Amino acid sequence: MRELIKEAVNSLDSALELRKLIIKKLNEKKLKESDIIEIVDAVDDLSLEEIQKLGSNLRTFPMGCDLVEIAVGPCSSSLTLIQFIENCILTDYMGFPIHICSYAVADIAEKEGLKPIEVLKMVLENVDVPIDIDHFGMYGPMRFPKEITHCYGDCYFKGPPFKGCPRNRIHKRLIEKEKEHADEFEDWIKLASTLCINVVEEQGGEEHAAPLEEMKIVAETAKKYGKGLEGIFHIGDGYDDLITGIKACIDLDVDVFVVEGAPFNRAKNRLKAFAKAIAVSRILVKGGVVATNGAYEDECRVGLRSGLNTILTGFPLNHHGYMCGYSPKTAKRGNFGLRRVMRIIKEEIRAGNVNATFIDKDMVKAIALGNRFLKGNIYPYSIGGFYLGDAHWAAIKESNLCKKLKINKTIDDISAEKVGLIGGRYISWAIAEKAEEVYISDTDSWVEKATIKILNEAGINAYPCNGDDKKVLEADKAYITTFIPNIALKILNKLRDSKVELLI
């Protein structure tokens, strides 16, 4: 794999081959620790500029998800119920997924004389975006003493290297309180879109996270109910800790890797270590999505340039409000990280440093409609050695938005033997699998080329149109495969042919 990784720095074809190899190993449960070490060593040999090129190539469709997004933490033990719900409503209006720190929800519920699950249901009554649940253990929401729930963020404020909590706090838990609502455990998971687990204990951070065996219980239950799974690990020393964290995530069949740097990045060359962690994660992550829940501003920027998809942030008083986008001496409780992180992402995209699109509500809705059209037959379902969709698709599938949307057609309504497809992404793959032969046109020459290659290798008769939408009209029937209305209508008006249909 070492040579393939070097080639993938400058070759999308090699990046495609690399991802196919890794996906095969993951699906067959044959990816070994020695493979992870080989990948980490190969990426370590690259310069920072080469690592950024590699990560960006691996974020390109279909090797990975080519969207950038923000996940938002709206809750804090300091908030009232109304303030918490208002934060959720605002986040939903912006179209960002909601990251629920379940201990804070339980604290708010306790103040209101409610059960924690009742507060979660109130959130779901008010939002449509995916709900991600964190700080969740074998009894449900974890519970912590006030010294932790109201932590000032001293470790982030003081900066690396992390040598234990500056105030000598440890990961204390109020287990008896957790047990009071243990009967709600599975209900929380059923209502969630995704669950977040923390494998830091495996990296030697016993004082900072729950036991791995407990995380395994959460992971297995999440998989039982078809929920997405995210795994948090520290960069640590940038080598052994990175290998251990990634292996633990793979062993638990995690869909999204969540990389934590900032004070937990103890590497000598911090920025190269962060970039390396993102690029290595891009190679190895099953669901094609790589996130960070802890990164100083310079790490956020180098991460975005190296293939990062998601930055977790939050409202004031939420601890994620200071964990991303700030620096030592400025990262502290009370920061409004959402606006800071949004600025950083916008600046990096505007400067041409990020080969990805900042997700908006139209895209989220389009993915939800795509889910409905495909009747939920998405990731981890695969065609030609690649997943049909990614972890974003799987999260949106489990959201209120996806459940509420109505659609005029489904994949079952496609019956023509010779089909023309305008757009070469996941929807086209699924339609191609049903037809005798397909003709595909995409404005992105790489998307068209990669899709034709994947479909051909799956035994499907697929032919390129080299971006010429009119060529697809040679088929019996043609479909515009985007679910973004203004784009679909623009294409339809340009072609003006009775053979062409919308899927919306």
From Swiss-Prot:
It holds the Pfam family Fibrillarin_2. InterPro entries: HcgG-like. To M.thermoautotrophicum MTH1137. NCBIfam families: monoFe_hyd_HmdC. This is Uncharacterized protein MJ0787. It comes from Methanocaldococcus jannaschii (strain ATCC 43067 / DSM 2661 / JAL-1 / JCM 10045 / NBRC 100440) (Methanococcus jannaschii). The lineage of its organism: Archaea, Methanobacteriati, Methanobacteriota, Methanomada group, Methanococci.
